[in-house]
């Protein structure tokens, strides 16, 4: 599901809201999560999951095309850990749809 598909789905479920209102709400939620992570804060949505940041140490990597070794700097990356309710819902959904994650996502 893309952001525009999410907006369309929420708009269909909430006909009293305009598409612009739904788009503003969705964008604001994403912005707030991004801003919190940029500050180093943890974002927990009970039952859904938690967004955190993880530090990746500097390392020596390899260019897959040339085989040349390259230095990869330390970096911070966003990380999502699914909550129990989300994991259970996904697992129940994939079992009902033939047992694959692709079946549950429609792809």
From Swiss-Prot:
Residues 87-107 are annotated as: Disordered. CDD domains: IHF_B. NCBIfam families: hip (TIGR00988), PRK00199.1 (NF001222). PANTHER family: DNA-BINDING PROTEIN HU (PTHR33175), INTEGRATION HOST FACTOR SUBUNIT BETA (PTHR33175:SF5). This protein is one of the two subunits of integration host factor, a specific DNA-binding protein that functions in genetic recombination as well as in transcriptional and translational control. Heterodimer of an alpha and a beta chain. This is Integration host factor subunit beta.
